[in-house]
Design a protein with these regions (language model features):
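Sec-dependent N-terminal signal peptides
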Residues: 4-13
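Sec/Tat signal peptide C-region and signal peptidase I cleavage site
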Residues: 15-20
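Conserved anchor residues at repeat-unit boundaries in beta-strand-based tandem repeats, strongest
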Residues: 22-31, 43-54, 66-77, 90-100, ...
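Short, solvent-exposed mixed-charge patches
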Residues: 147-149
Length: 149
């Protein structure tokens, strides 16, 4: 019985130690540079301030998304790049976790939009160039070309 108790006790300690390494911080995740691995295996590597993601960092999700860029109080804010699992990507300005400001979105098929975004939608002056050479240039509203120029 004593051996069984010792075995269970050691198993719990070993499992908890392994689990803690997989779902927690390595480095300084309070006010410095650290790596945090979430229980779903999403990983953040980068700067921290007051236990929030802050400064330059990278988040990698198990489903293939990767964001590399600036964080302010754990939100995507400033310059950053989001790569999608299908190979599409957005490079540009972020505010409050959304594409906001100037940016370039490239679809996996080679189509590309260069211009302004508001709340992750094409909005403002921009140009979409499709892989077949078709060009749509003008004022965009809510993701649609509203006025050609």
């Amino acid at each position: 019985m004593r051996r069984l108790f010792l075995f269970i006790f050691l198993s719990v300690i070993i499992c908890n130690s392994a689990f803690a390494r997989k779902t927690g911080c390595e480095g300084d995740c309070e006010n410095g540079i650290g790596t945090w691995t979430y229980t779903d295996q999403t990983v953040y590597v980068g700067g921290w301030r007051e236990s929030l993601k802050h400064g330059q960092g990278t988040v990698t999700w198990p489903n293939g998304y990767i964001y590399t860029g600036e964080f302010v109080d754990s939100k995507w804010q400033g310059q950053g790049t989001l790569i999608f699992p299908d190979g599409a990507q957005y490079i540009g300005e972020w505010f409050n976790d959304n594409m906001n400001g100037q940016g370039t979105f490239t679809w996996a098929n080679g189509d590309m939009y260069v211009g302004e975004f508001i709340d992750s939608k094409r909005h403002g002056q921009g140009t979409r160039t499709n892989a077949d050479g078709t060009i749509m240039k003008g004022i965009w509203k809510e993701g649609e070309l509203a006025e050609s120029n």
